[in-house]
A protein has these predicted regions:
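Glycine-rich phosphate-binding loops that contact phosphosugars or nucleotide phosphates
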Residues: 30-171
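Flexible inter-domain linker/hinge segments
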Residues: 1-12, 17, 172
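A short, well-structured juxtamembrane/interface segment
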Residues: 12-31
Length: 172
């Protein structure tokens, strides 16, 4: 519960996602018409949850790709594509390669990362730190939970910036 609190509470104000403390500009969310989530392992499963959240809430198409396959599939990326890289450590080699490809091809990039100053955090346009602390469980339950929360916050911000939900829907 503490990890979820640390991820969510500083970023919700009056029912709206607020990334100002993270220095994440609303501009990254403007005009997004497609989201690609890339990750490995547990983080990939959090991406699947995020896909359902975004598609159900705001009807933007989302694909979730294993980072190990992303760079080999020749993805179509442009300035209207938001690539979300999810990683606990911020150092996963395949996720870093996927991020670099997204950056090279002009996509907007944001990472959901636990470890401050990691390679993926440094190379992303923006980073949403989960502040989860070290993972004790082998099953990576804490990391999964906060990564899902991060995806929910991104969904809320996409909805708000692109006027895809009413204020009442946002507060629900």
């Amino acid at each position: 519960p503490e990890a979820l609190h640390n991820t969510i509470m500083p970023r919700i104000h009056n029912g709206h996602a607020d990334f100002s403390a993270d220095n994440i500009s609303d501009d990254i969310f403007k005009g997004v018409n497609r989201v690609i989530v890339t990750a490995c392992g547990t983080a990939w499963h959090a991406g699947l949850v995020g896909r359902h959240l975004i598609e159900a809430m705001i009807r933007i198409p989302v694909t979730v790709e294993l980072a190990s396959e992303f760079r080999y599939m020749n993805p179509i990326l442009d300035e209207h594509t938001l690539v979300v890289v999810i990683t606990q450590s911020g150092e996963t080699a395949d996720s870093l390669a996927a991020l670099r490809l997204a950056n090279e091809r002009g996509a907007k990039t944001i990472s959901i990362v636990n470890v401050k100053g990691s390679s993926i955090a440094r190379e992303s346009d923006y980073v949403l730190y989960t502040h989860a602390g070290p993972e004790i469980a082998v099953a990576s339950t804490k990391a999964f939970s906060v990564q899902c929360a991060g995806m929910y916050l991104i969904a809320l911000k996409l909805a708000e910036v692109n006027n895809l939900m009413t204020d009442e829907q946002m507060k629900d």
